[in-house]
């Protein structure tokens, strides 16, 4: 089946995998958990114990207002849903979720709050950095 693989600090990519449990566990590095945060017929398949195992934080899950309600730790997959199982994503789904998770995210903890920063903002060309320093 054709899935989207989303690794920490990387852009998503499409991969063909077997639909069996062992293939899914291999991809996410442990026991898997499926979550269904979208209206689309897709699932996020992630490592059930990713946070407990200290896997790197990957991407935030947001509600319809854009507020973060959870963060996925470790590599996760996005797979299509059939009536009773996971299935291949179609091209429209691949395009939509590739764009949604294109930019890796960084996470910073401040007290009880966690800030989510798109990784693209982290890397600033030297010319821009010098320009900002001169403005101070």
Where are these regions (language model features)?
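Non-Sec secretion/translocation targeting segments of pathogen effectors
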Residues: 126-136
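N-terminal nucleophile
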Residues: 1-15, 19-125
């Amino acid at each position: 089946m054709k899935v989207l693989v989303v690794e920490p600090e990387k852009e998503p990519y499409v991969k063909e995998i077997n639909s069996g449990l062992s293939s899914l566990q291999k991809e996410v590095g442990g026991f898997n958990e499926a979550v269904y945060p979208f209206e689309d017929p897709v699932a996020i398949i992630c490592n059930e114990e990713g946070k407990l195992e200290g896997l790197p934080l990957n991407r935030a899950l947001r509600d319809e207002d854009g507020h973060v309600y959870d963060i996925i730790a470790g590599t996760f997959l996005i797979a299509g849903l059939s009536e009773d199982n996971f299935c291949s994503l179609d091209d429209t789904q691949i395009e939509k979720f590739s764009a949604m998770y294109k930019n890796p995210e960084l996470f910073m903890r401040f007290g009880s709050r966690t800030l989510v920063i798109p990784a693209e903002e982290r890397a600033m060309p030297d010319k821009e950095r010098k320009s900002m320093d001169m403005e101070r």
